[in-house]
Amino acid sequence: MAQFFKAKPNSSKQLSAKVTLEVTKLDHLGAGMAQHQGKIVFIPGALPNEKVTVQLTEQKKRHARAKLLKIESDSNDRVEPKCPHYQQCGGCDLQHLSIDKQRSYKQSALVDLMAKLSHTEAESLAPALIGQEWDYRRRARLATHYNKESKQITLGFRASASKQVINIDVCPVLAKPLSDLIAPLSLLLNQLSGKKALGHLELIDADNGYFAVLRMTKALSDKDAKKLTAFANEKSISLIVQGNEGEFTILGDRNELPYYALDDVKLNFTPGNFIQVNAAINESMVKQAVDWLSVKPNERVLDLFCGVGNFSLPLAKSGAEVIGVEGVPEMVKQARENAADSGLDNVSFFHTDLSADLSKETWLGKVDKLLLDPARAGAFESLQWLKKMKPKAIVYVSCDPSSLARDSEPLLKHGYKLKKLGLIDMFPQTHHIEAMALFELD
């Protein structure tokens, strides 16, 4: 039998091709979507209702990716980005979209993802929790890179999908007093003899002042310590040096650790402890969670992934008995201290593996209501045993709607109804979507 040779398409020519496309919508990562030769093309930076010229950069069986080259006709929703480092820094990716449209896009993406992945709709869609669009971050970690040739430190954020550190001198989403510290700190760090030992820099806007936390892989020299101390006193900040083992030394006159308050509950935290970076949204989020759970003094509430007590302590203020569970021992210790400082004796904290079955733990007992605030990976393992506890109500705070949708399935199968769903706009100017869901046992 004769065999005929069929040449494969020239993929290099396909990828170098420039095409003009009509953008119809945004995907859940904020990239524009268009159609080309029967495939969906994802175009970062493009907006719906725009005609754009792009270069194809990746071809898959059912989709392609492209680089935005030129906007032939732009959307009425396109705005001028505020940050001079936008599209270089990998932090923000939606500054080119008006804030109102950012929020409506996120709301739609949340509802669509839940419907698509969990095959359910909420009985009630709550108003989005929103705050200021700029100057909202009370905490940020900046990376450092030492250049062996120039012998200089680059201080900034990493480029998108890259380890490259982009030099940053201002950050409009960071609280302005923290943003104003970046440039002088960059100058200071480059004056240190031990700058090669710099790991990262963390900036914190706490209720008791501003903090700069330097991660060092080697001990500071006396000369460098004096320079840092003088800077801390000049700027009236607390400067904390953190070593390899997590130990820290406070330099300067302000010898204290950071805290934030929720009403009359004070939450201390240390470098490395997780806290929500948007203070105003966190306050609204905690209030909404407490309202949705509607706890009563005779009820027992389980708070999984409790951290330093962000939800546990406000829940305990309602009079209910609260059990907080966390996988990081240092945060459990801090949560216990925070409860004691607030005079709350109706809350207990435990350290354990959150993926393990805790239903037989003697300290757990009956659970009337549940709050969980997991990391992006979600709480699928925990929900396998939690459903046996049959709490009457569950508030799930999610930083990844895909995980929330996946984790909803075992709850829905065991008689829970999705009563409420709401967007939490924790990170304006980015595509990141956070959400809160209320499940009740039918």
UniProtKB/Swiss-Prot annotation:
What Gene3D superfamilies does the annotation carry? 2.40.50.1070, Nucleic acid-binding proteins, Vaccinia Virus protein VP39
SUPFAM superfamilies this protein is in?
A: Nucleic acid-binding proteins, S-adenosyl-L-methionine-dependent methyltransferases
Entry-linked InterPro entries? 23S_rRNA_MeTrfase_RlmD (IPR001566), MeTrfase_TrmA_AS (IPR030390), MeTrfase_TrmA_CS (IPR030391), NA-bd_OB-fold (IPR012340), SAM-dependent_MTases_sf (IPR029063), TRAM_dom (IPR002792), U5_MeTrfase_fam (IPR010280)
Coiled coil: present as a keyword of the record?
no
- UniProt domain TRAM: residue ranges: 12-70
Enzyme Commission number, as recorded: 2.1.1.190
Answer whether the UniProt record assigns the keyword Metal-binding to this protein.
yes
Query: What are the protein's UniProt keywords?
Result: 4Fe-4S, Iron, Iron-sulfur, Metal-binding, Methyltransferase, rRNA processing, S-adenosyl-L-methionine, Transferase
Q: Kindly give the CDD domains that the UniProt entry links to this protein.
A: AdoMet_MTases
List the catalytic activities from the record.
uridine(1939) in 23S rRNA + S-adenosyl-L-methionine = 5-methyluridine(1939) in 23S rRNA + S-adenosyl-L-homocysteine + H(+)
Annotated positions binding [4Fe-4S] cluster: C83, C89, C92, C171
Q: Give the source's domain of life in one word.
A: Bacteria
Q: Name one GO molecular function term.
A: 4 iron, 4 sulfur cluster binding
| Enzyme class (EC, first level) | transferase
Query: What is a biological process (GO) this protein takes part in?
Result: rRNA base methylation
Active-site residue numbers: C399
Annotated residues for binding of S-adenosyl-L-methionine: Q276, F305, N310, E326, D353, D373
Against Pfam families, the record matches this protein to: TRAM, tRNA_U5-meth_tr
Return the HAMAP family for the record.
23SrRNA_methyltr_RlmD
Q: Which family does it belong to?
A: Belongs to the class I-like SAM-binding methyltransferase superfamily. RNA M5U methyltransferase family. RlmD subfamily.
Q: What does this protein do?
A: Catalyzes the formation of 5-methyl-uridine at position 1939 (m5U1939) in 23S rRNA.
The protein's name in its UniProt record? 23S rRNA (uracil(1939)-C(5))-methyltransferase RlmD
